[in-house]
Every structure is written in structure tokens, then in C-alpha cells.
A protein has these predicted regions:
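Intrinsically disordered, low-complexity serine/threonine- and proline-rich regulatory segments
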Residues: 1-15
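Short linear motifs in intrinsically disordered/low-complexity regions
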Residues: 3-4, 19, 134-137
Length: 144
């Protein structure tokens, strides 16, 4: 299925739940980010994902921190990898974004943080990511 057809089905909530997996979520987010500035893509994808979850009878499935964090990571990769890449090439170069479990978010968040009600309802900043200063200090001291 081409990108626009998948997005259209997603927006109409016509994709069957067993036919819309993590990789499809990433693909739709990737499409939004190629078409819209980051704030608009975040708003559109989030609103449509909420509607999709509601249509599937799972209104509590939407998770703000997971959704926002993935869009931020995808956007960063698009900027680094060039927005002109076709989906299959982008997916091949970014395999770590395509795996749901284990998730790339484990690099940035503690499990209990993502499991919190606060992280579900509003975006929470990463709590596992070390600052560049801390990494540089460890490197200078020879501690790894």
C-alpha cells in the first residue's frame, strides 16, 4: 500500500487494528513529518491516533509521551537523513525506530516513568538520557 493510502485509511479509522502495527504507526508519523512542520505533525498525528484508538474501542490506548517522543526521534532522523528518502529506505536506515519491544525509548526513559499516568496524559521529558557534559566528564576521567 502506498503512503497516502495508508494515511487516508488511518485518518478515516478504517485500518483494522490487527493490520496496523508499530511500523505502520511510524510510517504514518514519518509521512506527517514530511508533509507538515513538527508542531502541526504532532497535533495532527496525535489527534488522529486518539480518534483511531477510540474507533477501535480502546480510548485509553493513546500515550502522549510515547507518541511525542517517537515523533521527535523520527523528525530528528528526517533532518539528519534528508526528508526526500522513500519510506522503505528510511525504514531500512532506522531499524531501531521500527521495533516496538524492545523500544528505542528505553534509552531515554525508565520503564516506571513511561508506565506513569502523568506520562500517559502529557509529555514527560526523558529521565534516562545523560547530558553531553556528563558523558564527556566520564570519558575524561576514564570511567565507563
Amino acid at each position: 500500500m502506498d503512503d497516502e493510502s495508508l494515511v487516508r485509511l488511518f485518518e478515516r479509522t478504517e485500518v483494522p487494528p490487527d493490520g496496523f502495527h508499530h511500523r505502520d504507526h511510524v510510517r504514518v508519523a514519518w509521512w506527517y513529518l514530511r508533509q507538515h512542520p513538527l508542531p502541526d505533525a504532532l497535533a495532527r498525528f496525535g489527534a488522529n491516533l486518539r480518534r483511531f484508538a477510540l474507533a477501535q474501542g480502546k480510548p485509553d490506548l493513546f500515550h502522549e509521551t510515547i507518541t511525542t517522543a517517537y515523533l521527535l526521534l523520527i523528525n530528528e532522523r528526517l533532518d539528519a537523513e534528508h526528508r526526500g528518502l522513500a519510506w522503505e529506505e528510511f525504514a531500512a536506515r532506522n531499524g531501531d525506530l521500527m521495533t516496538w519491544k524492545p523500544s528505542i525509548l528505553a534509552r531515554y526513559y525508565r520503564e516506571e516513568t513511561l508506565a506513569s499516568p502523568k506520562a500517559k496524559r502529557t509529555f514527560v521529558m526523558p529521565d534516562r538520557l545523560q547530558t553531553a557534559d556528563a558523558i564527556n566528564e566520564r570519558a575524561k576521567s576514564g570511567k565507563d
